[in-house]
Amino acid sequence: TITAGDLTVTAGNIDVVAGTLDVQDGGAITQVTNKGNGVSLSTYSGQITTTNAALAAGVEVTFIVTNTLVAINDVVIVNVQSGGTPGEYMAAVTTVANGSFHITLTNLSGSSASDAVILNFVVIKGAAS
């Protein structure tokens, strides 16, 4: 048990045989006005609620998430938690940069959709060395 400080492994692996890997530095933000507006949330995990502005059938929209904890070599994962009917929306991280990442949200349905979509994300720190 580590109650304070860091754990550094210089060789070998860290294996989670049973249990979960929890990222508990989280936050939440709600987008305003339209689904193309950026948001700012500097946490390693979080929840973004989009506006309920209409998104036409088959259309995608990209918005920026400003996050001071993100670096260019990090991996950011996003998924749709809820909003609309299952399978109606798809979310993907399309760009990662120092201090931000972009999420592209696509309406996969055959009609316009006006849902407040809830997206969950997590940042995994990476390196290029």
Residue ranges and their predicted role:
Residues 1-19:
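Register-specific beta-strand positions within repetitive beta-rich fiber domains
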Residues 87-93:
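Short, surface-exposed beta-strand/strand-loop-strand elements in extracellular ectodomains
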Residues 77-78, 88:
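Short linear functional motifs in flexible/disordered or boundary regions
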